[in-house]
Swiss-Prot record:
Protein name: Purine nucleoside phosphorylase DeoD-type
Organism of this sequence: Clostridium novyi (strain NT)
Family: Belongs to the PNP/UDP phosphorylase family.
Domain of life of the source: Bacteria
Reactions this protein catalyses: a purine D-ribonucleoside + phosphate = a purine nucleobase + alpha-D-ribose 1-phosphate; a purine 2'-deoxy-D-ribonucleoside + phosphate = a purine nucleobase + 2-deoxy-alpha-D-ribose 1-phosphate
Any GO BP annotation: purine nucleoside catabolic process
Name of the gene: deoD
Record lineage: Bacteria, Bacillati, Bacillota, Clostridia, Eubacteriales
Length: 233
């Protein structure tokens, strides 16, 4: 056991999907995995292990924001030896060409968070995805006939941000969407030498105002889930 994860040793697979919403973790386990065990319910942050097409895979809720995902990622790596950590989450589009329900593979993750500035003594670090996972996910998506978007995203500490000019600036520099976790995950991947990737479904468009419901975000974004599960080794 670790501080926030109640699993015993060997109960967690080497590949773990990381949805922010613990109910999405439950949905993935119940609808995609076989021979499922629930290894964690500490703080209501469910974790499950099962098999997908014969391959062992786990799914662990993380909560929202860089501090929260960093807690779970740290413990999964340090206490349980996880090698592949794949965020499956949502983001808001800030690009007019990125539509609701599009899938984005986050090649890099900018941030306005102070966590990396603290970690690197005021200097900037460029958190990026693992190329192998990124390439495999892209190829899987294309083989399924999906229009996969690949590019930079922003991991923001602010969910409600009134500074529209800042959003326009990020968009001007090619950032595709905004979420709240990937930068922290990618930084820890670099620190520990493990593979990390964020696969994101666009849940709303900051450009057009179109959005999806909470239930849709929990249960209908299955294409990104399937791509992530196919990455299990």
């Amino acid at each position: 056991m670790s501080t926030h994860i109640g699993a015993k040793q060997n109960e967690i697979a080497s590949t773990v999907l990381l949805p922010g919403d613990p109910l999405r973790a439950k949905f993935i386990a119940e609808n995609f995995l076989e021979d499922v065990i629930c290894y964690n319910d500490v703080r209501g942050m469910y974790g499950y292990t099962g098999t997908y097409k014969g391959k062992r895979v786990s799914v662990q809720g993380t909560g929202m924001g860089i501090p929260s995902i960093s807690i779970y990622a740290n413990e999964l790596i340090e206490s349980y030896g996880v090698k592949n950590l794949i965020r499956v989450g949502t983001c808001g589009s800030i690009n007019k060409d990125i539509k609701v329900r599009d899938i984005i593979l986050a090649m890099g993750a900018c941030t306005n968070s102070g966590t990396n500035r603290m970690r690197f003594n005021g200097m900037d670090f460029a958190p990026i995805a693992s190329f192998d996972l990124l390439k495999k996910a892209y190829d899987i998506g294309k083989s399924k006939g999906l229009d996969i978007k690949v590019g930079n995203i922003l991991s923001s500490d602010l969910f409600y941000n009134d500074d529209k000019d800042a959003i326009k600036l990020w968009s001007k520099y090619g950032v595709l969407g905004i979420e709240m976790e990937a930068s922290g995950l990618y930084t820890l991947g670099a620190k520990y030498g493990v593979n990390t990737l964020a696969i994101l479904t666009v849940s709303d468009s900051i450009v057009t105002g179109e959005e999806t419901t909470a239930k849709e975000r929990e249960t209908t974004f299955t294409k990104m889930m399937e791509i992530a599960l196919e990455l299990a080794e």
